[in-house]
UniProtKB/Swiss-Prot annotation:
Destroys radicals which are normally produced within the cells and which are toxic to biological systems. Its cofactor is Cu cation; Zn(2+). It comes from the Eukaryota. Keywords: Antioxidant, Copper, Cytoplasm, Metal-binding, Oxidoreductase, Zinc. It comes from Striga hermonthica (Purple witchweed). Its EC number is 1.15.1.1. This is Superoxide dismutase [Cu-Zn]. It catalyses: 2 superoxide + 2 H(+) = H2O2 + O2. It is found in: Cytoplasm. One of its GO terms (molecular function) is superoxide dismutase activity. One of its GO terms (cellular component) is cytoplasm.
């Protein structure tokens, strides 16, 4: 779900999403 927001940043955003998957709401690229 949050991955959609990260998709705008491309692959880098997706990788960050995976790294922040445990804390997606607290991640630097969450919202």
């Amino acid at each position: 779900i949050v991955a959609v927001l990260h998709s705008s940043e491309g692959v880098a955003g997706t990788i960050t999403f995976i790294a922040d998957s445990q804390i997606p709401l607290t991640g630097p690229n969450s919202i």
